[in-house]
A protein has these predicted regions:
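Oxyanion/phosphate-interacting regions
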Residues: 77-82, 97-157
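Glycine-centered flexibility sites
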Residues: 7, 14, 24, 40-42, ...
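Glycine/serine-rich anion-binding loops at beta->alpha junctions
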Residues: 1-10
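Acidic beta-strand-loop-alpha-helix segment within the catalytic core
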Residues: 12-98, 147-157
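Residue-level marker of alpha-helix boundaries and capping positions
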Residues: 2, 67, 87, 112-113
Length: 157
């Protein structure tokens, strides 16, 4: 997203404890917004000198599915089609996870490659807001592996 100069990039920092993101800090430099939080700490957003707590929302009808602006592959399209009545929310980079934390989306299926540094910080923020991120089989995300690529995953409120 940075290379494409579309303003949808983030700077991500995660504190890892036992290969689990316990705290995350995400910055969106273009709109000067900061997000931070952790599973047992809560989550917040600072924008325009206003500090707001973040909370996921109950799943809406139609379901609000957030997907990549630049990596919407056929597997993701098929996954979304199987959800039934949906509205597509597009965002780039780790902003997709943050849209769920802000209550602006319900689910984010990621069925294309990402790396650990793409998700760990925003996962901590999302979990602080009440959401979750799991591999598509429902098992927890794995970090600190020899292979830094993430498995396919689903984030949800």
């Amino acid at each position: 997203e940075f290379i494409n100069r579309n303003g949808q990039f983030t700077v991500n920092l995660a504190l890892m404890e036992d290969n689990v993101p316990s705290f995350g800090f995400v910055s969106t430099p273009i709109d000067q917004t900061l997000y931070w939080g952790g599973k047992h700490l809560g989550a917040w957003r600072l924008r325009d000198n206003t500090l707001e707590p973040l909370h996921t929302q109950a799943c809406q009808t139609p379901m609000r599915v957030v997907a990549s602006k630049s990596h919407l592959n056929q597997a993701t399209r098929d996954f979304i089609a199987n959800l039934g009545d949906t509205t597509l929310v597009q965002a780039g980079s780790s902003l997709k996870l943050l849209r769920i934390a802000e209550g602006e989306a319900d689910v984010y299926p990621r069925l294309a490659p990402t790396c650990e540094w793409d998700t760990a910080a925003a996962q901590a923020v999302l979990e602080g807001a009440g959401g979750k991120v799991t591999q598509v089989d429902g098992s927890p995300m794995e970090y600190g592996k020899a292979n830094i690529l993430n498995p396919h995953f689903v984030a949800s409120s």
